[in-house]
A protein has these predicted regions:
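Non-catalytic accessory regions flanking glycosidase/transglycosidase catalytic cores in CAZymes
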Residues: 1-144
Length: 144
């Protein structure tokens, strides 16, 4: 392994931030029983970017109720034009907390892979046009 060395007597200019995360900070704002929070440390780290890939497996963000299309739109037989068909609660909170900590979010629009024996939500949709409408409404929600 190579060692990165600097001559501190020379000026090199600004360093590009290289730190980023998958998932934002843990915050106790709405989860008072949460054992721990890393919000202040996360904010102090000044992390420029975070993505929310496969966060449905992390209970701290809402577990099976956040980020995946099947979590945000849990009943595929529901009307995709009815705002009541969508559950943005946990996903909104994770994104809001991340933004409040000063971190920009890369939103992953998709579905968490299921490596278990039984698959529940990783099958192709039964109606691709409806799936596209659902995706469109999720994108619109986060680009208001």
């Amino acid at each position: 392994m190579e060692t990165l060395q600097f001559d501190l007597t020379k000026e090199y200019g600004k360093f590009k931030p290289l730190n980023a995360t998958n998932g934002g900070p843990w915050h106790k704002r709405f989860t008072k029983k949460m054992v721990r929070s890393n919000y202040e440390e996360y904010k102090a780290a000044r992390i420029p970017y975070s993505r929310n890939h496969d966060l449905a497996v992390h209970t701290v963000y809402g577990g099976p109720y956040c980020h995946d299309i099947s979590c945000i739109f849990p009943n595929f037989d529901a009307n995709p034009y009815d705002p009541k068909s969508y559950d943005f609660g946990c996903t909104d909170e994770e994104i809001l907390t991340t933004l409040e900590a000063g971190t920009k979010t890369f939103f992953r629009l998709g579905q968490t892979i299921e490596n278990q024996i039984v698959k529940h939500n990783t099958f192709p949709p039964k109606d691709f046009k409806k799936w596209a409408v659902i995706c469109e409404h999720i994108i619109r929600h986060y680009n208001y």
